[in-house]
Amino acid sequence: MLSHKKSLDILRKTNALLEGHFILSSGLHSSKYIQCAKLLSYPSKAEKICKSLALKIKKNFRKFDLILAPAIGGIVIGYEIGRILKKETIFCERVKGKFTLRRGFKIKRGSKAVSYTHLRAHE
């Protein structure tokens, strides 16, 4: 698992870590924002970040069935985490401001999903 410092170094080197004042889609405010598209321009670095996230998920969520990623920016990150953890991965999309399952995706009753909407960077 990458150290927090190493993760931030990768995000800075790929210009994925933006610093300033951001109002996230949830309405939360943040002084930092991770632009996943920038990170994904560097597959080997993105793989390291995703592997580290996957290990953290595995450590903190012992029993789960699938990864639920947000569209659009989180789809590739979710895919890579699912690949590493060997878990089904689906994504949701915003429809009128609410995350919604579309494209035939369903979550079976009783299934446990790990979901994320904002990956916030802090020091």
Language-model features, listed with the residues they occupy:
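Short, flexible coil/turn micro-motifs enriched in small/turn-prone residues
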Residues: N15, F22, L68-A69, I77
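Conserved hydrophobic/aromatic pocket- or pore-lining residues that grip, position, or stack substrates
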Residues: G27, I67, T89
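Short glycine-rich phosphate-binding loop at a beta-alpha junction
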Residues: K63-A71
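Active-site-facing substrate-recognition patch
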Residues: L2-R62
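Short, glycine/charge-rich flexible loops or terminal/linker lids adjacent to PRPP-binding catalytic cores
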Residues: I77-S115
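Short coil/turn segments at beta-strand junctions that form active-site/ligand-binding loops
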Residues: R62-K63, S111
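Glycine-rich beta-to-alpha active-site loop
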Residues: G74
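Conserved small/polar residues in nucleotide/adenosyl-binding loops
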Residues: T117-E123
